[in-house]
Amino acid sequence: MNAYDYYGEARALAEALKNAGFPAYGSEISGAMDEGETGTEIFMMMRARLANLLADGKLPPDLIARLRALHGRLNDALT
């Protein structure tokens, strides 16, 4: 069983992004949890949005590392 707290990390990451001056980026992540109907849909939306945020290149290294980690875990869960 996978005990990783995807939603908890996503919420914490969204808050960290907002606190670091990237409120729109944080809203992208939290929005996926609000907009998705099923767990799979939420995971797919978060994975896509995280990929877009990673491609942006404006974030500090610590947040990039957290985005990559969550993106990787979501990718593993969906494949």
Per-region residue spans from a language model:
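C-terminal-biased regions
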Residues: M1-T79
